[in-house]
Every structure is written in structure tokens, then in C-alpha cells.
């Protein structure tokens, strides 16, 4: 039995991240007990001057883009990322596997350095692309939830049987399936993807409403927004929702789907800023991700600070910082199984210096990598 005790820390406990001065008893990677009592044995960390926060979760990243940092700046979004012939796809296809692996591994190390314990990756390249990423991070102390894709979904002439076969092939090695967007696939293909993910008990996710033009095309071609079509197909994890139209947000709320926000990426690509405050008011479960490494570092500390300030600026109203920290931690638990400090959950934690009297703003506004004193993943101390 491996035991680690974190003593006297200010823990951000439960889904609401409630500050409490407690001791954490960790056994075999799991939080066994949260208590006022002193544990009788085990390796100890004195956290009396530290805050204990769930390790951060990057809920949307394309780590394969690590081979194309800052390429294509200023070009139209579709020229850069739209499959199958966007700039990034051409670069990925022409990059040797060894180069891709090294770049992805370096980006994973960067995430670890910045307190990230888990990430959800949207991986191109079919089953081989998924397996390449698994190999790249296999011995690193970070959990990769890898959603794959296959170019067959873009083929208008592919049979239902062929699409189903290829989707199943990806799902055999991945944690889910995530096509680029509703603008590149038919509604029938979208339904097949969701059906196969549900059958396998895996995640079905898709980009929607990232920019106005894709929404306009969807309305003209189908009479429905990208969001409506994605929800009709049954997707439960939507990415971006930067430019909702009509009743999009209410439909998302009614469906129970979660939304991954990527405001730094949206800003970099001049796509707009999602209506974050309105989504929160409607009760939509919001997650946060850094998106393409082409445009952004995979740093959730920077993502949180940008999110808080741009949300307040766009709404011209106060927005609680705890809600932004929840986007990067506890709101992700349904998809990652982490992000919550509570008995029975995995011990994925960061212990950070208290830099101000407000625990949430201290992390969001002021914490840098150097202020993360300990990173604990599955109950083990991680060297950064």
C-alpha cells in the first residue's frame, strides 16, 4: 500500500471548489480520506502555506499540431484547418512519424509543467494517429483521452457500412470519435458516429459554430444551424459554440450537452468570443481547452486568465472566477473521471503558492509554473 498525506492545506473541495483547511490521505492513487485528524503514517507534505487544487484538465487540444507552431497566421481559418486539404492537414501528412512523436511528447511535457494532469485530444490520422500519440506519451505522468477520426467521414460516396466499419476501427484504439465539424459531414454520417460511440461506451464530440460562415452555410443548405444538427445526431460534447444563432443555446441546455470553450483560439483566429456568461446563466456545463497548438501554447493558466477577463469585458458585467476554475477542473469529471477533490476520486492535484487572499484569483491571475510547488498524479509526486 502506497500512502501519501497532504497536511494542513487549503483544499478546494468538491465540485464547487469550496476552500477548506483539511488533511488529505491518499492511498494507492485514490483520495481515501479528507479529515481534520492527523494521519498516523505515510509520506507527508506540509501544505500549510499552499492551496491544494485539482490538477488542471485541458479539454480540447490538437497536440499533433505541435509540428506546425505559428504557421499560417493571418490566413482564413478554413485555409488552415479545414480537412482534408487545410494547411495543417498537409503538414501532418508530410511529417515523419518520429518528428510527430517528438513534437507531441514535448507538448505533453509542457502541459505537465503547467499543472495539467489530463487532456482530451482530437487526433487526426485514423487508428495509426491515435496509436502514435499513445506511444508518444506512454511513459509520461499525464492522462490522454484521445478522440480519433477517419477521413472516410468526408467521403460523400462512402457507404453506410464502410463508414461504420472505419469508425469502429478508430474506436477500437481510441476513447471516442471527433470529426472536424458538421460542415464536412452529412447528418447521416453524424448519426452513425454517435451510434457507434454509444455502442462502444465512448465519447462522441464535434466542433460547432466556430465561425459565422459555417453557420450561414448550414442554415442555407439544411435549414438548421450546425448546433441543431449536432444535437439531433446526439453529440454530447460540443466544441467552440462561438457563434450561436436562433435557439442554439437553449437547445444545448435542453439536451444536456457540454460545451468546451476555446476563447484564446477564437481570438487568435478572429472568430469572435463565445457568449460565455449567457451559457453559464442557462446552466450549460462549460469546459475549457487551448485548441490548436498552431495558434496557442497548451497552458491552461493562460487560458483561464484570458477567459475570465474577456468574459467580463464582453458582458460588461462581473463573472465569478470560481466558475472559470471549475471549467478547467470539476466540470470535466463526467468525461475524465478527475477534476474533483473528494473521497474516492483519483489523487490528481496541484499544490500551489498562495499569492493573494482570493484562492481563485490567486490561481487564475497570478500563478505561473514556478508557483506550482507539487504536482501529484494518481497519488504520485511528479518531477516537472
From Swiss-Prot:
Residues noted as binding Zn(2+) in the record, renumbered to the chain? 60, 62, 207, 291
Report the EC code(s) recorded for this entry. Answer: 3.-.-.-
The reply on keyword Iron is no
Broadest EC class? hydrolase
Q: Which SUPFAM superfamilies does this UniProt record tie to the protein?
A: Composite domain of metallo-dependent hydrolases, Metallo-dependent hydrolases
Q: Name one GO molecular function term.
A: metal ion binding
> Keywords for this entry?
Hydrolase, Metal-binding, Zinc
Q: Per the similarity annotation, which family is this?
A: Belongs to the metallo-dependent hydrolases superfamily. ATZ/TRZ family.
| Official protein name in the record | Putative aminohydrolase MTH_994
This protein's species is Methanothermobacter thermautotrophicus (strain ATCC 29096 / DSM 1053 / JCM 10044 / NBRC 100330 / Delta H) (Methanobacterium thermoautotrophicum)
Amino acid at each position: 500500500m502506497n500512502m501519501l498525506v497532504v497536511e494542513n492545506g487549503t483544499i478546494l473541495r468538491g465540485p464547487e471548489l469550496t476552500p477548506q483547511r483539511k488533511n488529505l490521505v491518499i492511498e494507492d492513487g485514490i483520495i481515501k480520506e479528507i479529515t481534520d485528524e492527523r494521519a498516523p503514517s505515510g509520506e507527508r507534505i506540509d501544505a500549510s502555506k499552499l492551496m491544494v487544487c485539482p490538477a488542471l484538465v485541458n479539454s480540447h487540444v490538437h497536440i499533433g499540431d505541435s509540428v506546425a507552431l505559428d504557421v499560417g497566421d493571418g490566413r482564413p481559418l478554413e485555409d488552415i484547418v479545414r480537412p482534408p486539404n487545410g494547411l495543417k492537414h498537409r503538414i501532418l501528412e508530410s511529417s515523419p512519424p518520429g518528428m510527430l512523436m517528438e513534437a507531441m511528447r514535448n507538448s505533453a511535457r509542457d502541459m505537465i509543467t503547467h499543472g495539467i494532469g489530463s487532456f482530451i485530444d482530437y487526433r487526426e490520422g485514423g487508428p495509426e494517429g491515435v496509436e502514435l500519440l499513445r506511444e508518444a506519451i506512454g511513459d509520461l505522468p499525464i492522462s490522454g483521452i484521445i478522440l480519433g477520426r477517419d477521413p472516410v467521414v468526408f467521403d460523400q460516396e462512402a457507404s453506410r457500412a464502410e463508414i461504420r466499419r472505419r469508425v469502429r476501427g478508430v474506436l477500437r484504439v481510441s476513447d471516442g470519435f471527433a470529426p472536424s465539424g458538421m460542415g464536412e459531414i452529412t447528418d447521416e454520417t453524424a448519426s452513425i458516429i454517435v451510434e457507434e460511440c454509444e455502442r462502444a461506451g465512448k465519447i462522441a464530440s464535434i466542433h460547432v459554430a466556430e465561425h459565422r460562415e459555417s453557420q450561414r452555410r448550414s442554415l442555407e443548405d439544411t435549414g438548421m444551424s450546425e448546433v441543431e444538427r449536432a444535437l439531433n445526431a446526439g453529440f454530447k460534447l460540443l466544441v467552440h459554440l462561438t457563434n450561436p444563432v436562433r435557439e442554439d443555446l437553449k437547445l444545448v441546455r435542453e439536451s444536456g450537452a457540454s460545451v468546451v470553450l476555446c476563447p484564446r483560439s477564437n481570438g487568435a483566429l478572429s472568430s469572435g468570443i463565445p457568449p460565455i456568461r449567457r451559457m453559464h446563466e442557462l446552466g450549460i456545463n462549460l469546459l475549457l481547452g487551448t485548441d490548436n497548438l498552431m495558434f496557442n501554447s497548451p497552458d491552461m493558466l493562460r487560458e483561464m486568465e484570458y477567459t475570465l477577463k474577456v468574459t467580463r469585458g464582453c458582458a460588461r458585467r462581473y463573472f465569478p472566477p470560481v466558475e472559470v476554475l471549475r471549467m478547467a477542473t470539476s466540470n470535466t469529471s463526467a468525461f475524465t473521471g478527475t477534476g474533483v477533490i473528494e473521497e474516492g476520486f483519483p489523487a490528481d492535484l496541484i499544490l500551489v503558492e498562495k499569492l493573494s487572499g482570493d484562492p481563485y484569483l490567486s490561481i487564475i491571475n497570478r500563478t505561473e509554473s514556478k508557483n506550482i510547488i507539487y504536482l501529484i498524479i494518481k497519488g504520485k509526486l511528479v518531477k516537472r
